[in-house]
Amino acid sequence: SLGGFLKGVGKALAGVGKVVADQFGNLLQAGQ
C-alpha cells in the first residue's frame, strides 16, 4: 500500500539523516 511505502521511505530517510547528523557532529568536534 502507498501508506506502508511512505512509512518505509520515512524510516529510511530518518536512518540516513541520523547517520549524516552523527558524521557532521564528529566533523564539528574534530574541527575544534
Curated annotation (Swiss-Prot):
Biological classification of the source: Eukaryota, Metazoa, Chordata, Craniata, Vertebrata
Cell compartment(s), UniProt: Secreted
GO biological processes: defense response
Keywords: Amidation, Amphibian defense peptide, Antimicrobial, Secreted
UniProt record similarity statement: Belongs to the frog skin active peptide (FSAP) family. Dermatoxin subfamily.
Gene Ontology CC terms: extracellular region
Keyword Secreted: yes
The protein's name in its UniProt record: Dermatoxin-J1
Modified residues (Glutamine amide): Q32
Tissue and organ distribution: Expressed by the skin glands.
Function, in words: Antimicrobial peptide.
